[in-house]
Amino acid sequence: MAAGRVKRTTRRKKERKNVEHGCAHIRSTFNNSIVTITDAAGNTLSWASAGGLGFRGSRKSTPFAAQMAAETSAKAAMEHGLKSIEVYVKGPGSGREAAIRSLQAAGLEVTLIKDVTPIPHNGCRPPKRRRV
């Protein structure tokens, strides 16, 4: 083994894509909110989640946490030249509307809002009811 040799790792530079129109996928569950912004082909430009921003426990499921996640994701996507988005919302969480409003407030033009929550045609048995 050669003494004094250091293995260098080079980090690949992020490609700066130039995308005008994209899609925002908002997944809002009872526990967390995740906002992913993609180009038209579905390749991820940016994403953020309430838990990733430092919200923990029951604070992750608040509308404010979803708003912050959408804002962070939108700012990162606008660096790629994004101007308008289609919004696809999935899940029953409380951060749905707050995330959409935050995307509009960040300066993105929302061209479509669609609910893509999967609804079973009587598939799997749901979890038992909570008794509090």
From Swiss-Prot:
Transmembrane helix as UniProt keyword: no
GO CC annotations on file: ribonucleoprotein complex; ribosome
GO biological process: translation
Origin superkingdom: Bacteria
Keyword RNA-binding found: yes
GO molecular function: rRNA binding; structural constituent of ribosome
Keyword annotations from UniProtKB, A to Z: Ribonucleoprotein, Ribosomal protein, RNA-binding, rRNA-binding
PANTHER family on file: 40S RIBOSOMAL PROTEIN S14/30S RIBOSOMAL PROTEIN S11
HAMAP family the UniProt entry points to: Ribosomal_uS11 (MF_01310)
Protein family membership: Belongs to the universal ribosomal protein uS11 family.
Assembly notes: Part of the 30S ribosomal subunit. Interacts with proteins S7 and S18. Binds to IF-3.
Stated role: Located on the platform of the 30S subunit, it bridges several disparate RNA helices of the 16S rRNA. Forms part of the Shine-Dalgarno cleft in the 70S ribosome.
Protein name: Small ribosomal subunit protein uS11
